[in-house]
Amino acid sequence: MEEDQELERKISGLKTSMAEGERKTALEMVQAAGTDRHCVTFVLHEEDHTLGNSLRYMIMKNPEVEFCGYTTTHPSESKINLRIQTRGTLPAVEPFQRGLNELMNVCQHVLDKFEASIKDYKDQKASRNESTF
């Protein structure tokens, strides 16, 4: 029972509210009755292949993860089902959180490099304009 409360506490930080004042969960954790915490399906609402495949890749880099895959429920629905199965004693929510954090770090790195390249380009363009006068 304490493990379930701890697991719920960990994923509660990942839940968000949607617009229009209506509270809607962006993330659900689905576990079949009688299964353990090592094999869990996460339902991510308002997401598609962009997040699904990137997150699956990041999670599969973890050696403790035995399986990670995702499906889109239907082309007209914007939600994905992400299934994670771990080896040993690691609960599935751990590599899920780690994968999200690592993916955010990669995205931040790409953004930083992109902004630095834009700045370099603008600086080079400005120096060329100054040298022509």
UniProtKB/Swiss-Prot annotation:
One GO term describing the cellular component: RNA polymerase I complex
Subcellular location: Nucleus; Nucleus, Nucleolus
Taxonomic superkingdom: Eukaryota
Keyword Metal-binding belongs to the record: no
Protein's GO biological process: transcription by RNA polymerase III; transcription elongation by RNA polymerase I
Entry keywords, A to Z: Acetylation, Disease variant, DNA-directed RNA polymerase, Nucleus, Transcription
N-acetylmethionine found at: M1
Pfam families hit by this protein: RNA_pol_L_2
Family matches, as InterPro entries: RBP11-like (IPR036603), RBP11-like_dimer (IPR009025), RNA_pol_Rpb11_13-16kDa_CS (IPR008193), RNAP_AC19 (IPR033898), Rpo11-like (IPR022905)
Subunit comment: Component of the RNA polymerase I and RNA polymerase III complexes consisting of at least 13 and 17 subunits, respectively. Pol I complex consists of a ten-subunit catalytic core composed of POLR1A/RPA1, POLR1B/RPA2, POLR1C/RPAC1, POLR1D/RPAC2, POLR1H/RPA12, POLR2E/RPABC1, POLR2F/RPABC2, POLR2H/RPABC3, POLR2K/RPABC4 and POLR2L/RPABC5; a mobile stalk subunit POLR1F/RPA43 protruding from the core and additional subunits homologous to general transcription factors POLR1E/RPA49 and POLR1G/RPA34.
Disease linked to the protein: Treacher Collins syndrome 2: A form of Treacher Collins syndrome, a disorder of craniofacial development. Treacher Collins syndrome is characterized by a combination of bilateral downward slanting of the palpebral fissures, colobomas of the lower eyelids with a paucity of eyelashes medial to the defect, hypoplasia of the facial bones, cleft palate, malformation of the external ears, atresia of the external auditory canals, and bilateral conductive hearing loss.
Job description of the protein: DNA-dependent RNA polymerase catalyzes the transcription of DNA into RNA using the four ribonucleoside triphosphates as substrates. Common component of RNA polymerases I and III which synthesize ribosomal RNA precursors and short non-coding RNAs including 5S rRNA, snRNAs, tRNAs and miRNAs, respectively.
Family statement: Belongs to the archaeal Rpo11/eukaryotic RPB11/RPC19 RNA polymerase subunit family.
Protein name per Swiss-Prot or TrEMBL: DNA-directed RNA polymerases I and III subunit RPAC2
Annotated gene: POLR1D
